[in-house]
């Protein structure tokens, strides 16, 4: 697995994260970040990465100029893996916390991390997670006014956009 763009482009991520993690492919990440770069840009943005797994999404945001990334995952092996990369690469603007992504605000408060609005919230919950709409409702207060909420989910899932300010 490698970083697809930005300052850290082509750096390889060791694959010593938990077995149940399913990192986004290089092609998917490259498409996602090309779209973000084209429509909004990342430079100086704050990012919340939930269900962060391997940490690859956080690293892609940092590589492209995010000023701060907060990653939350409940798996200890994933957290240790992310902290190992953070320390060996000297990534001071990457904050990593072990906790439940659904209670992200409480987790950030517990670790004394800023809960100021995020420009991007990326969530990659398990595909069988019930109540994705509930997750959206919990995350909306953490999102900046013109922020992007990006959730990976089953193709057949339809979110209720009336109860949020979601566009697409």
Residue ranges with predicted function:
Residues 1-165:
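Class I S-adenosyl-L-methionine-dependent methyltransferase catalytic core
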């Amino acid at each position: 697995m490698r970083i697809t763009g930005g300052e850290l482009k082509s750096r390889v991520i060791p694959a010593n994260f938990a077995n149940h993690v399913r990192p986004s492919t290089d092609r998917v990440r490259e498409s996602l970040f090309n779209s973000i770069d084209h429509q909004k840009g990342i430079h100086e943005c704050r990012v919340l990465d939930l269900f962060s797994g391997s940490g690859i999404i956080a690293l892609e945001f940092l590589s492209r100029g995010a000023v701060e990334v907060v990653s939350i995952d409940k798996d200890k092996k994933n957290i240790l893996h992310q902290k190992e990369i953070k320390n060996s690469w000297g990534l001071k603007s990457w904050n990593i916390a072990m906790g439940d992504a659904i209670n992200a605000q409480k987790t950030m408060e517990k670790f004394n991390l800023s809960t100021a609005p995020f420009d991007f919230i990326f969530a990659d919950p398990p595909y069988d997670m019930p109540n994705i709409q509930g997750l959206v409702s919990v995350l909306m207060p953490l999102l900046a006014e013109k922020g992007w909420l990006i959730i990976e989910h089953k193709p057949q899932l339809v979110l209720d956009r009336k109860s949020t300010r979601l566009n697409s």
